[in-house]
Amino acid sequence: MRRAAALLSVPCLLPMLLAACTGLSAGPEVSSMAPVPASRDSAWVRAKRALTAETFTLDVQDSLGGRITAMRYPSATAKVGTAAACRVQLALAIQGTWDGAQLASSSRWIAPAEMAQSKPDVCEKDRQETLARIQEVVVPPAK
C-alpha cells in the first residue's frame, strides 16, 4: 500500500520540480586563484564567514578537503532586470599548510532567461562585486 502511494506522488511532484528549474540561464564559469597569508584553517573560517555575510546557502562544507560550494538565491521580491534577481553559484577550494594557503574559486551567475539575454552585464557586475567582497574577507588588504 505504501509503495502505491509513493508511486502516485511522484507524477504530482515532477511538474513542480520541472517548473522550478525552467526559465533560467547561466553565465560563463569564471575561475581564479589567490594566495592567502594565513593558515588553511584560518582561510576556511574566513571563507565561511564571508559566505554567511553575503547570505549564501552552503551546499557542501568539507573542512578536511577544503571544499565549499554555495549558492546565493534571489529574494522573493526581487524584480527581473535588477541585480537582486541574479543567483551566484560559487565553489571554493582551500589548500595549504599552517603558514599559508591558496584559495581557488569557480563562480557563475544564473538569471531568468529573459534577463540573461537582455541584461547579462547586470548579473556579471553583481557576481564580480560579490566575489570582491568575499575575497576582501578571506584575503584582507595589506595595511
PLM region spans:
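Bacterial N-terminal signal peptides that target proteins for export
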Residues: 1-13
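C-terminal motif of bacterial Sec signal peptides marking the signal peptidase cleavage site
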Residues: 17-20
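Ser/Thr-rich, low-complexity intrinsically disordered terminal regions
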Residues: 22-143
